[in-house]
């Protein structure tokens, strides 16, 4: 029906099953991290018609920050347990959710926006050092 917003065509569980690469926890993390990122970039929702779009690069950075807030030094370990070891993994999850109509994208958005945004070891481990007194 024209003008009526379309809801998701599949459940999140179906999308997870169809992609077959990551557990549902990873998809839920990306959804929560997207909300975190949008709020950080655009602030609290004021105008419901205003664009709240974020780029793939912005989302990757937001997901990095969100993971570090949630898990600190264990962030990279938790993500690796879910099979997320590169920023491209975030992109695969996002685009699976787009295909299932859980998320929307612009014509300019592509999976390439998530390619090599940062190195996981540097991005998650660089700020943490254990200092041992000699």
Where do the model's predicted regions map?
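Intrinsically disordered or highly flexible coil/loop and linker segments, enriched in small
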Residues: 21, 39-47, 72-76, 103, ...
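Cytosolic covalent-transfer regions centered on His/Cys nucleophiles
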Residues: 22-26, 35, 87, 95, ...
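A contiguous binding-surface segment within folded domains or other stable secondary-structure elements
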Residues: 34-68
